[in-house]
Amino acid sequence: MKKHLYIFIAMLLSFGLKAQQNIIAHNSGNNMYSSSTSVIDSIKFDTNYSKFKLSGNSTTLDIQKTVIDSLTFTSNTVNLTKIYIIYNGTDNATIINPYSTQGVNITASGGTVNVVSTATINNLEYNLLGTSATGSLTMSSTLPATFVMNNLNITNTSGPAINIIGGQTHTFNLQAGTINSLTDGSSSTKNGTLQTDGKIIFTGTGTLNIKGIKKHGISTSGIIEVQNGSIKVISAASDGFHSEGYMMSNGTVNITATGDAIDAGDAAISISGGNITATLASADVKGIKTGTNTISISGGTINLALTGAQSKAINAKGNITFDGGNITANLSGAAVLTASGSGYDPSYSTAIKTDANIILNAGTLNLTLASTANGGKGISADQNITINGGTITVTNAGNGATYTNISGTLDSYSSAAITTDLNLAITGGSVTTTSSGTGGKGLKADGTVTIGTATGSPTLNIKTTGARFLVSGTDYSHPKTLVATGAISIVNGNNTFNSTDDGIHSDTSVSISGGTNTVNAISTVIGVGEGIEAPIINVSGGLTNVTASNDGINATYGTVSGGTEQNDNSQFNVSGGIIIVAGNDAVDSNGNITITGGYLIATGPTSQPEEAIDFNGSFNINGGTVIAGGSNANMTKAASTTSTQPNMFLKSSAQLASTSLIHIENTAGSEIVTFKPKNNVYYFHVSTPTLLKNTQYKVYFGGTYTGGSYVGGSTGWGLYTGGTYSTTGGTLKSTFTTSNTANVNTQSF
């Protein structure tokens, strides 16, 4: 068809048309070239080119036949508005320049093209086509320009494929359906295969493949903005993208580099859409990085894989904010100890790291650190971490280890799913973490931790499955699901903490005022596994269920040796809510216990010396409901005589089986408590607001309870409510009358 068209053109030219006609060569729907037929001496065709010979010119305009979509004629005036640079292998590039008299000067020597533009027209369009293994484009422009890349393939073994100076914003439009490629050479004196000193904008839906042999794939002292297109850095000796700022709203970026994938210098990064994939294998590199500035991610899909030591997937010195997006990061690089002071300073592989704050409002994060990433961190901030929404999953298998710190002291590090040097606040969203390495931490803060608000209810599922490891002497690094130097406040949420060692620990205090909270701290090591541990523990609301292999509740300053009765003035206070505890001891305070409201439901061990409730100071029951069953340890004491609510301390010589019940009622048959213990027990602490002075009560072991449920919805054991007790099959163990004056009533049977 095209051959017939060319014959037809030749016939028309040979006859010399009476009317003035213009011939137009089209490319990709555009008018690429036009000339009056009256000045065309001839059009010839060889293997590669259509050769246009104009009157008075000794040379021909050679246009590759493959880039001419069609030739048409018109009697209308044709205004060409686009510049074409067509690379022809080792032949001179074809230049079609309708602005040659308006300040645009273009020269070509083989595939080396130089453009100097002083034109006063914004965004002149340069269409780049063809192939050259020895080509380049160098341009100086005083105004922004647009480059349409239409199956452009340039390799420059001695410099950048494209180098633009002038500090202007330039747009690279990747023509739909095209595949373009740029490659530089090792002898280049520039930093990028595509290099500019101004902002770069990518548009279009075509593909651009880049090889950065010398250094970076794309390098600019301005911003890189990806609005669309598929950009693939196949390889880079250093960074894939190296810029001062990065923006992305659509398109696809795929980077394999020796250095960082995207290095935005000290300027901001904003990602609202598109897809980013990066594969990095070197040590101490970053997937997405800015220096002193911020990173904001509100959309898009990001997949980052880093295998080098101490690498970071997303890294900034400023704030990192997530308002959307789907982020996946996989890291496997080891920790690195750098000599400093009198020892070493460790650095770890980290999925998200900032020297400032991290704010997560929305989005999905899936962060994985392999077992080779010892000491690795999922999310780490030198300042605060605030999670208001989104779905976060961190899987961390890195082990901990000992090292000599910069002060010359033996120290240790361990992996952590989420860690901050200041405060952690989780007010919404879903957070799931698994830390399986030795000494691994789930949530860790050197400041305070707040979970939930009055209206914000997050979902937490925090798990540690690793073992403790010895640091020195009797000092171990313990796995902990939630640990803070400052106060921990649980206000709301559906929160589950599962640990093979410690559950919740604060050096200051733990306060629970709401939420549904489950803590399981189960260790195979004797004496290990604290459920909730802090000097001050306050429960004022919510539903909390604690199961521990050692102490369920441990109020301590850590200054009192085990087995002693010294009061360190620590506190366990219950003023509201429901707390259900099973442990060995269930409740242990090296100081005082005060109950003024709510429910305390506890089961201790069967065998002494551990107890259901162990305290060194006072145990005041001034309100609320208390039911606790434990061993017959000689150390077990009744509540303090300063209690203001009547209570019972019941000491049975016979064991109550965990399959049985203890039931207490008044002479009218009104139920005071019906309790099924988790373990076989002997001694009980009982108090409810309905318990009265100078009143006769009956105590039964056994019997049956129909209907109803356990307070707090516990499973298998607890305080019954809402059903009916029957003495059938039960044994009346004691009938007695409470004191007319004292609130503490001790009975043995």
What do the PLM-derived regions correspond to, one by one?
Residues N30-S34, T59-T60, A668-K676:
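Surface-exposed loop/edge segments in extracytoplasmic proteins
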Residues M1-N22:
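Bacterial Sec-dependent N-terminal signal peptides
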Residues T77-F749:
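A composition-driven surface/loop motif
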Residues Q20-I23, N48-K51, I121-L128:
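Short, hydrophobic/aromatic-rich segments at coil-to-beta transitions
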Residues Q21-H26, S50-L54, S660-E665, Y697:
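Short polybasic amphipathic segments
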Residues T37, Q64-V67:
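Residue-level hotspots within well-ordered secondary structure
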Residues Q21-S35, I40:
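Short N-terminal segments immediately surrounding and downstream of signal-peptide cleavage
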